[in-house]
């Protein structure tokens, strides 16, 4: 599903007409967020968004996983597995599972870190613990109360911010902002844009940590695309950001094709892309997430080999502040668990 364009424009007649529905949706979401979660025995760090759509949760999860490994932890990612058919809990095996089974994001992350997919988050956390997790990284699920969270790190795009600030379906917010701010421990602003400044100020006023980060392209991707006109395509939450990242890196984006988030590519989609690339001499480039979907389908394997993945990592402006924050939250969580165990 593609997000409506009016979400990220000034309030309009349509968004105003939808605000009563947003008020109902928001009231339900806020009530749900207030419910107590189940403690799962190990620290839980949740990476989420205030809004629907993409903002960089997956690169953030991978960056946090690398930090946790440096700290001697054994992180396991817990994901709902959006777009996959398996309800779980199941440990993701890239050699056995495809995107249609577990979703594209878990499949991509499972190349680097253990990932558990589960619609039932508590059951998924139990499986993660059985796999030796010393820390659970919850990928999304900020608004889901099932599992008690020891820290919530919210990711936001600095260029887009929160759009019109309304709740779904009138705007992009998954719940009213005040109850979300109250549960936010850190805000990660990705990119140099200033659209997120108001919410960043609100998080700081609430005592939360503000972190800024940016995407860094992998050298291999830059080398493969240097001096070539490319046809860039993506089926992610914010394809415009992907295209902008390519251009910022100096890539000659000659053409773009946008698909819905988590789009299951069909034969005709790939035939159309191949025809344009062949006719105009373009190199095909897409996101790692899209390529994970393509590679996992045997029918699309040949096409996937013709596509260059544009790999990125997330670099924090103040890596020490993030490290200190994580260490503090892990220490607090373990102290709390010990006290609960003695009571």
UniProtKB/Swiss-Prot annotation:
One example of a Gene Ontology biological process annotation: lipid A biosynthetic process
GO MF, one example: tetraacyldisaccharide 4'-kinase activity
Protein name: Tetraacyldisaccharide 4'-kinase
Enzyme Commission (EC) number: 2.7.1.130
PANTHER family: TETRAACYLDISACCHARIDE 4'-KINASE, TETRAACYLDISACCHARIDE 4'-KINASE, MITOCHONDRIAL-RELATED
Gene name in the database record: lpxK
Pfam family, one: LpxK
Any one GO CC term of the record: plasma membrane
HAMAP family reported for this sequence: LpxK
Disulfide bonds: none
Catalytic function, reaction form: a lipid A disaccharide + ATP = a lipid IVA + ADP + H(+)
Pathway where this protein functions: Glycolipid biosynthesis; lipid IV(A) biosynthesis; lipid IV(A) from (3R)-3-hydroxytetradecanoyl-[acyl-carrier-protein] and UDP-N-acetyl-alpha-D-glucosamine: step 6/6
Xref: InterPro entries: LpxK, P-loop_NTPase
EC class (word): transferase
Binding site for ATP: 51-58
Role played: Transfers the gamma-phosphate of ATP to the 4'-position of a tetraacyldisaccharide 1-phosphate intermediate (termed DS-1-P) to form tetraacyldisaccharide 1,4'-bis-phosphate (lipid IVA).
Family under the similarity heading: Belongs to the LpxK family.
UniProt entry keywords in alphabetical sequence: ATP-binding, Kinase, Lipid A biosynthesis, Lipid biosynthesis, Lipid metabolism, Nucleotide-binding, Transferase
């Amino acid at each position: 599903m593609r997000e409506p364009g009016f979400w990220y424009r000034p309030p309009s007649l349509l968004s105003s007409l939808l605000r009563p529905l947003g008020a109902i949706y928001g009231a339900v979401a806020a009530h749900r967020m207030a419910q107590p979660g189940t403690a799962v025995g190990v620290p839980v760090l949740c990476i989420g968004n205030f809004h629907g759509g993409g903002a960089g949760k997956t690169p953030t999860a991978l960056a946090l996983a690398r930090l946790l490994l440096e700290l001697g932890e054994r992180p396991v990612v817990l994901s709902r597995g959006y777009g996959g058919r398996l309800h779980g809990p199941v440990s993701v095996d890239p050699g056995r599972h495809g995107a249609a089974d577990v979703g594209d994001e878990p499949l991509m992350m499972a190349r680097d870190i253990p990932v558990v997919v589960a619609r039932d988050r508590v059951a998924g956390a139990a499986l993660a613990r059985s796999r030796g997790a010393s820390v659970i990284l919850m990928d999304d699920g900020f608004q889901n109360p099932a599992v008690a969270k020891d820290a919530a790190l919210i990711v936001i795009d600095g260029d887009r911010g929160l759009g019109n600030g309304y709740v779904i379906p009138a705007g992009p917010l998954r719940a009213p902002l005040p109850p979300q701010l109250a549960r936010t421990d850190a805000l990660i602003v990705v990119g140099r844009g200033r659209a997120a400044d108001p919410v960043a100020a609100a998080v700081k006023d609430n005592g939360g940590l503000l972190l800024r980060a940016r995407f860094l392209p992998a050298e291999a991707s830059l080398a493969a695309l240097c001096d070539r006109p490319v046809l860039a395509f993506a089926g992610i939450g914010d394809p415009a950001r992907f295209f902008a990242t390519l251009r910022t890196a100096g890539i000659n984006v000659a053409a773009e094709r946008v698909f819905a988030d988590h789009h299951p590519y069909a034969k005709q989609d790939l035939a159309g892309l191949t025809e344009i690339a062949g006719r105009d001499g373009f190199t095909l480039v897409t996101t790692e997430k899209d390529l994970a979907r393509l590679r996992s389908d045997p029918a699309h394997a040949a096409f996937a080999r013709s596509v260059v993945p544009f790999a990125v990592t997330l670099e924090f402006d103040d890596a020490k502040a993030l490290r200190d924050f994580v260490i503090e939250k892990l220490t607090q969580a373990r102290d709390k668990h010990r006290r609960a165990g003695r009571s």
